[in-house]
Amino acid sequence: MYSCNSGISAQAANETTSLAYLDVPGYSGETAANECFPACATLNGQTTGYAFWSPQYASLDSWSSIGNSAYNSGQLSLRHHSGGLSFDLNYTYSKSTDIGSNAERVSVFEGLGFSSQIINAWSPNQLRGPSDFDTTHAINANWVYELPLGKGKRFGGGMSKLADAVIGGWQISGLWRWSTGYPFSVYPFYSWPTNWDLESNAILVGKKPKTGQFIVAQAGGGTGPNVFQNPGITNSSDPNAAVNQFRDAYPGESGQRNELRGPGSFNIDMGLSKTWEINESQNLKLSWEVFNVTNSVQFDAGNIQNVNNYTDSPSSFGNFINTLFKPRVMQLGARYTF
């Protein structure tokens, strides 16, 4: 494994701008391969669909150094530190591909289109595609700003100690992030054409459905959030519906991994604090922090209803069932330094 990292930076007054390129290919990464029972098994030189290594096992996983991956990105950063204001602004354009990966949101058994296990051990590269954690565009910013009010500051530098106790010592901070969505896969239910233990992904044969975060009509009435603009929930016979754009994998196929992309996300966290200077060695700081300031509801492409059962349950195909972030949370804190 090797990596290539090059960059250039320029500084003007109190601001620094950086441009960087990062290339990180990966070879011989550990990957779990399910040894393809029973569809690919042989017995006495003859192919048979139901031969097991042992009557006690229906499948057998093994770890092998056969994984490969590649990560390429361009990064642009702007930093400022002056006058009580410090901030970082960063943009990343990247692409990450591999034959199996995990994201933090994935459970112990990696199913529902986010599997890191190899379906066809004789052709592991069939699963090569965008990494589960791949985000094409990402922008983030963080800042800390000490308000220029109070003794020794730009405004009110000569105010009394009592006035400074009220007006001075205030600080605002924040963290903002926006990114494009994570990839996800679709696969049918009860479909093991290649591997007895692992279902193959579906294969896109029609027009790629438009994905994002949409409010669509539901089969039981009303509306609800869905990853597809036209999932086909209320009209599964619509030839343009997302549910009709896929086919089951054939024997020997692993299907398409992470062919589709979920909705993007953004989040804002902010904090407000007040510090009282008691003497040169002691101070008291009270803080108020808010997470998900806008209380925005953003759905998780890793938890979509029946993307693993589109053939049998089209009436709920593509419905979101989990969110990426928790609702707005606030916390208060106190810190005494001595």
Residue positions per predicted region:
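Short, solvent-exposed micro-motifs at the edges of structured domains
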Residues: 1-338
